Each structure stands twice: as structure tokens, then as C-alpha cells.
Amino acid sequence: MTSVEQRTATAVFSRTGSRMAERRLAFMLVAPAAMLMVAVTAYPIGYALWLSLQRNNLATPNDTAFIGLGNYHTILIDRYWWTALAVTLAITAVSVTIEFVLGLALALVMHRTLIGKGLVRTAVLIPYGIVTVVASYSWYYAWTPGTGYLANLLPYDSAPLTQQIPSLGIVVIAEVWKTTPFMSLLLLAGLALVPEDLLRAAQVDGASAWRRLTKVILPMIKPAIVVALLFRTLDAFRIFDNIYVLTGGSNNTGSVSILGYDNLFKGFNVGLGSAISVLIFGCVAVIAFIFIKLFGAAAPGGEPSGR
């Protein structure tokens, strides 16, 4: 082996050893938090999984038995599950899309505001600081016929909360109003990392505001965008409060979380309710996995390229 080859091999081994040492350090730093998380969450998840494999109804406590995947079969062949899943996915897709567009616009405004920047940020974040149930009731009363200021704008005898599509539209509005500030806050953090010199150089080169946004700003804040979309998608998929207050899940407006609540706390069916919660957990895990695979290193937990 020549001296050049020896130096090359030494450099490769050095980089490999450095990477392994870096990963060992990362595992050591993460281990305490990971162990605490496992200790707190492993038992509830495991117990829910165990209950999902049993016929367990509190109304008939003496009729408990292990039935394997029977509860999952019952759920997956039932139209109520698929209706609730479709409603959940529709609310998630529409609300997160609108929140991203509005959140990006608000983030750009807050980032560029020169006077009263703190006041603008505080005003934008107020809706996010309101308890979801309180905000939901404010929307509920606003759309109640006869007393609601928004319902009074509609034709006489209109009751939007008694119809599926109008109800889902109101749920989306409530979601967007409440959580757009969260989206804008995450995107604002990403905008702070965009070099002003780069934007000025693009402007000098004749790039329009739209091209600076699409060719410079958005690519550079991609990690912040992915984090914001991932967190909001997972949160929106588990929607419960707004639907529970506004419609109670009636008229085919219930989400998968509402379906689980109805089976567990209204029907006292611990087995079916636990199975639904496990399915929700599985759906959330699949969504997170898809985000990581689609966006790679930009997604939380993604593997950096070349590593």
C-alpha cells in the first residue's frame, strides 16, 4: 500500500470513528429522556394494546374474554370507522393547508414589521393562548340561530351546525383560527435564519418578490416548514375538542377520536375503545413515518444526507 493510500485509509477510518463517537454521544445525551418517556408511556400503551385484544364491556363485567384481533375486525368492517377516518383526514388536510398559507403570511408580516413588532406578535398569538374548549364554545354560540351574531347573517331558519358540510366548515374555521398562530410562530423562527444579504443579492439580480419567496426563502426554511406541518398534522388528526363542543359528532361529523370516546365513555366498551385508540396511534405513527421518508433530513429524526 502506498503512502497516499495509507493516508486515505487513515482519513476514512478517522471520519468513521468520529461519526461513531458522535452517535454514541448523542445516544448518551438522549438516553435519560428516552428512558423517562418509556417509563411514563410504555405501560399505558401496552395496557391499551392488551385491552384491545379482549371482549371487555363494563356493562357486562362477567363476560370478559380474550378474543385476539376480534375488536379490530369489528372496527375495520364497520362503516362508522371509515366515515370517521374520512372526516378526520378531510379536516386535517384542509385545516393544515389553510393554516400553512395564513401562517406563512403572518410570519412574513411579523418578520418584516419594523414598528411595534412585539405588539404585532402578541396580538397574533392571542388565539393560541385561549383554551380550546373556551374558543369552541365561542364559535358554538356565534353560530347558534337566534342568538349568534354569525348565524344572524345567514338566511332565516338556517342552522349550519345541524348539517354535515356546513358543520365541518365551521370546525375547520375554528381549528384555523385557534392554531394558525402556532404555525406562524414556527415559520417565523425559520425566517430568522434567512440571510438578509442573500435576499438583497436576489433583489439586485432582478428577482421579483414571488421568486425570492419561492426560490430563496421557502427552500431555506424547509426544516421549519416540515416541523410545523408535521406537528400540526399529527395534532389535527387527533382533533376532539372542537367537534365535541360544536357538533358532538352528530350528522357524520365525528372524528376517530370522537368515535373512540363514544365507544369507551358512552358505550362502556373498553375493548373496542382501546382498539380504536391503538388504531389512532398507528395512524399517527404512519403519518410521522411518511413525513420522515418524504422530507428526509429536513424532517425531525431524518438522516442527514451523506451520513
UniProtKB/Swiss-Prot annotation:
<keyword id="KW-0472">Membrane</keyword>
<comment type="subunit">
    <text>The complex is composed of two ATP-binding proteins (SugC), two transmembrane proteins (Suga and SugB) and a solute-binding protein (LpqY).</text>
</comment>
<feature type="transmembrane region" description="Helical">
    <location>
        <begin position="168"/>
        <end position="188"/>
    </location>
</feature>
<feature type="transmembrane region" description="Helical">
    <location>
        <begin position="25"/>
        <end position="45"/>
    </location>
</feature>
<keyword id="KW-0812">Transmembrane</keyword>
<feature type="domain" description="ABC transmembrane type-1">
    <location>
        <begin position="85"/>
        <end position="291"/>
    </location>
</feature>
<dbReference type="GO" id="GO:0005886">
    <property type="term" value="C:plasma membrane"/>
</dbReference>
<keyword id="KW-1003">Cell membrane</keyword>
<dbReference type="GO" id="GO:0055085">
    <property type="term" value="P:transmembrane transport"/>
</dbReference>
<feature type="transmembrane region" description="Helical">
    <location>
        <begin position="217"/>
        <end position="237"/>
    </location>
</feature>
<dbReference type="Pfam" id="PF00528">
    <property type="entry name" value="BPD_transp_1"/>
</dbReference>
<feature type="transmembrane region" description="Helical">
    <location>
        <begin position="272"/>
        <end position="292"/>
    </location>
</feature>
<protein>
    <recommendedName>
        <fullName>Trehalose transport system permease protein SugA</fullName>
    </recommendedName>
</protein>
<comment type="function">
    <text>Part of the ABC transporter complex LpqY-SugA-SugB-SugC, which is highly specific for uptake of trehalose. Involved in the recycling of extracellular trehalose released from trehalose-containing molecules synthesized by M.tuberculosis. Trehalose uptake is essential for virulence. Probably responsible for the translocation of the substrate across the membrane.</text>
</comment>
<dbReference type="InterPro" id="IPR000515">
    <property type="entry name" value="MetI-like"/>
</dbReference>
<feature type="transmembrane region" description="Helical">
    <location>
        <begin position="89"/>
        <end position="109"/>
    </location>
</feature>
<keyword id="KW-1133">Transmembrane helix</keyword>
<feature type="transmembrane region" description="Helical">
    <location>
        <begin position="123"/>
        <end position="143"/>
    </location>
</feature>
<comment type="similarity">
    <text>Belongs to the binding-protein-dependent transport system permease family.</text>
</comment>
<dbReference type="InterPro" id="IPR052730">
    <property type="entry name" value="Sugar_ABC_transporter"/>
</dbReference>
<dbReference type="InterPro" id="IPR035906">
    <property type="entry name" value="MetI-like_sf"/>
</dbReference>
<dbReference type="GO" id="GO:0051701">
    <property type="term" value="P:biological process involved in interaction with host"/>
</dbReference>
<keyword id="KW-0762">Sugar transport</keyword>
<keyword id="KW-0813">Transport</keyword>
<keyword id="KW-0997">Cell inner membrane</keyword>
